[in-house]
Amino acid sequence: NKMGINSTEVSYGFGQLGSAFNDGTSAMAPPTGKVFVAITMLADTTFDTSAGLVADNDSDNGLEYIGTVFARDTDGVVNDAAHDEPSSTATLGSGGTVVDVNNTFPKGITIYGRWTSINPASGSFIAYIGN
């Protein structure tokens, strides 16, 4: 018997729909209807403070990802961070902070989430595309 996962749903959720390389400062977007699901840093990398990491959040269901801009939410604050409510709720956590250009992601690290746009300020990376 062979055991393993042979699911396109799992594959599509983990970057098997392609990847894109960036070593400049131009914003990049995934194909229509897709998102970036992981970013591997090839050099120390920073993201633009304004729209550097635009997360595909679904805060109604507790799905929030690190990013630079958040236009949600239940506490009435427009641009706060993922999981940064005054106190934890059934769907939202507390204590998260917004990523800005002062946050350096070191070479070799991979971050996971769902982003609709990536705008680097410095460094180089590979972004993986998923559903």
PLM region spans:
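Surface-exposed intrinsically disordered loops and tails
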Residues: 54-98
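Beta-sandwich interaction modules
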Residues: 13-31, 91-116, 125-130
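Intrinsically disordered, low-complexity, compositionally biased regions/tails
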Residues: 8, 17-22, 28, 37, ...
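Solvent-exposed, flexible loop/coil segments flanking beta-strands in beta-rich domains
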Residues: 2-49
